[in-house]
């Protein structure tokens, strides 16, 4: 896969280009030990440069990694982590929303319910998925699947990756705020384990609507916020160009959110971000989900609900 590099990754991109150039020179010829040695040195330098850049990302750079066009989405993780995924569609009231995907699957043989936001890569796919911004029917579909999981005693696993709930007139007319609020209420009371992971953007109420859980985790370069940095900047400074300043002030990174005890853990990403190696990222995520699930399965239903309630009530300052 040819990688897309962000502007702050240009030193890495230049090293990658040099490596590719040397590989082309060496391709189809007898092994040139001198060229092989140069490639090896450049790869080591590339690795060190990547470590240096990604160990010093600011909040705005992290937000851009979270939005990377090649970053894995829910439908990239599902086949790498689960088996026998059977997608379920529709809210049984109005329509099917492709910005939310969900269905039954097995995690190492155990039945689970999966729900996640889904963005698109091509223009047609982005339109089909509404750029990952769910409408009310998407959240009502998620609610239907959660209630089904409750009936069949299946753990719920959610993947969060949305810039926010869709703010269109039609969505508001069909009860966007009610759909989100109802999900929050129901998720707080479900008696099955709920494990939520922010895999990309955790945008405001659109993220929270499938984000109330017993365990809430974030990938290393994911973000979680009440509004996008651009939206915040437009309100406070009347220009989206102040987005980097807004991102720093809002505390949107996994590290900052963990310091505030709003999430349980941070899932490590491959060097350079999840898009550099989807298989490795999926393996890390699967390990984290299995660890959380093993801890939660030992609790009774009453204990599960009580601990979830206590977790929610611990937020904020008093």
From Swiss-Prot:
Record's subcellular location: Cytoplasm
Biological process according to GO: fatty acid biosynthetic process; malonyl-CoA biosynthetic process
Pathway stated in the Swiss-Prot or TrEMBL entry: Lipid metabolism; malonyl-CoA biosynthesis; malonyl-CoA from acetyl-CoA: step 1/1
SUPFAM superfamilies named in the record: ClpP/crotonase (SSF52096)
Protein keywords: ATP-binding, Cytoplasm, Fatty acid biosynthesis, Fatty acid metabolism, Lipid biosynthesis, Lipid metabolism, Nucleotide-binding, Transferase
Residue span(s) of domain CoA carboxyltransferase C-terminal: 34-295
InterPro entries noted in UniProt: Acetyl_CoA_COase_a_su (IPR001095), ClpP/crotonase-like_dom_sf (IPR029045), COA_CT_C (IPR011763)
Disulfide cross-links: none
Principal place of residence: cytoplasm
Catalytically driven reaction(s): N(6)-carboxybiotinyl-L-lysyl-[protein] + acetyl-CoA = N(6)-biotinyl-L-lysyl-[protein] + malonyl-CoA
Domain of life according to the entry: Bacteria
GO MF term list: acetyl-CoA carboxylase activity; ATP binding; carboxyl- or carbamoyltransferase activity
E.C. no: 2.1.3.15
Keyword ATP-binding on entry: yes
A single GO cellular-component term on record: acetyl-CoA carboxylase complex
Subunit structure: Acetyl-CoA carboxylase is a heterohexamer composed of biotin carboxyl carrier protein (AccB), biotin carboxylase (AccC) and two subunits each of ACCase subunit alpha (AccA) and ACCase subunit beta (AccD).
Entry's family note: Belongs to the AccA family.
Matching HAMAP family: AcetylCoA_CT_alpha (MF_00823)
Function text: Component of the acetyl coenzyme A carboxylase (ACC) complex. First, biotin carboxylase catalyzes the carboxylation of biotin on its carrier protein (BCCP) and then the CO(2) group is transferred by the carboxyltransferase to acetyl-CoA to form malonyl-CoA.
Name of the molecule in the record: Acetyl-coenzyme A carboxylase carboxyl transferase subunit alpha
Lineage start: Bacteria, Pseudomonadati, Pseudomonadota, Gammaproteobacteria, Alteromonadales
């Amino acid at each position: 896969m040819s990688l897309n590099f962000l502007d702050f990754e240009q030193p890495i991109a230049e090293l990658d280009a040099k490596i590719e150039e040397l590989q082309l020179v060496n391709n189809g010829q007898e092994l040139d030990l001198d060229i092989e040695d140069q490639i090896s040195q450049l790869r080591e330098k590339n690795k060190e440069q990547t470590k240096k850049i990604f160990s010093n990302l600011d909040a705005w750079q992290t937000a851009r990694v979270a939005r990377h066009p090649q970053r894995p989405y829910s439908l990239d993780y599902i086949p790498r982590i689960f088996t026998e995924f059977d997608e379920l569609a529709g809210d049984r009231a109005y329509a099917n929303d492709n910005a939310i995907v969900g269905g039954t699957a097995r995690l190492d043989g155990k039945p689970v319910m999966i729900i996640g936001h889904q963005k698109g890569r091509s223009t047609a796919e982005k339109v089909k998925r509404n750029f990952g911004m769910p409408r009310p029917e998407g959240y009502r579909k998620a609610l239907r699947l959660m209630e089904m999981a409750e009936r069949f005693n299946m753990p719920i696993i959610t993947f969060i990756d949305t810039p926010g709930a869709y703010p269109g007139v039609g969505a508001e007319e069909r009860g966007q705020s009610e759909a989100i609020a109802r999900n929050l209420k129901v998720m707080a009371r479900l008696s099955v384990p709920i494990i939520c992971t922010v895999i990309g953007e955790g945008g405001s109420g659109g993220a929270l609507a499938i984000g109330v859980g017993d365990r809430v985790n974030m990938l290393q370069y994911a973000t979680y916020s009440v509004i996008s940095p651009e939206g915040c900047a437009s309100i406070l400074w009347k220009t989206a160009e102040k987005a980097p300043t807004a991102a720093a002030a809002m505390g949107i990174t996994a590290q900052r959110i963990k310091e505030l005890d709003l999430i349980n853990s941070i899932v490590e990403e491959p060097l350079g971000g999840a898009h550099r190696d989807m298989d490795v990222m999926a393996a890390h995520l699967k390990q984290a989900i299995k660890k959380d699930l093993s801890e939660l399965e030992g609790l009774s239903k009453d204990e599960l609900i009580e601990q979830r309630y206590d977790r929610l009530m611990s937020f904020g300052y008093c």
